[in-house]
Amino acid sequence: VGPLWVWSLGCSTGEEAYSLAITVERAMREAGREPRFGIVGTDISREAIFQARRGIYRTSKMSAVDESTYAHYFDQVGKQLWRVKADLRRRVCFLTSNILTDKSPLIRRKMHLIYCQNMLIYFRRWKRRELVNQLTEHLDNRGCLMLGLGELSNWTPEGFARVAPRAVQAYTQIETVEQGEAL
C-alpha cells in the first residue's frame, strides 16, 4: 500500500494542513502502521503560502493545542512563538494555486482525501457545483471529499454519496460506499 495523500484546499497560512498532518500521523501510528503520507496545501495568496511554509505560529493562534501536541510536533522558537518540527514540515508541501484559473492542475496525483472547508461559501451555487465536480476528478477511486457543513446543500456530485455521520459533509464514490471501503 502506497502513501496516503491529502489536499488541503484554501489552506491559508497552513494551520489546517499541519493539523491534518498531525491527525493522519497519529491515526497511522495508533493503527500500527508506518506513517507514510503527504499533505498538499494550496491557497491563492502568496503571502499566506510563504507563512505556511515557515510553519511558525503565535501561542494565541494555538489555543486548542494540548501539551502533548506541543511536545511532539512543535519547537519553541521565541517568546510566544512555535514552529512545526522539521519532520512534520517535510510531509507538507505548500503551493500557490487559484482553482478558478489554473488550467493544468498543480495536483498531479490522485488524492485520498480532499479537505475544502469554508472556501465554497464565497461562490454562487452553480460555481460551487462546478468546483466540486472539478475536485472529484482529483480523488482516488476510494477517496473522500470533505466540505464545510452547509457549503453544498440539496445537491450531491454525480456518482457520489454522502458519508455518515451528518455532522460532517463528506462524499465518496457510490461504488466505494456500497462496498464499505470508505476512508
Show where each model-derived region lies.
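Conserved SAM-binding loop of SAM-dependent methyltransferases across substrates and taxa
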Residues: 13-31
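Core SAM-dependent methyltransferase catalytic element
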Residues: 113, 155-183
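Conserved class I S-adenosyl-L-methionine
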Residues: 3-14, 40
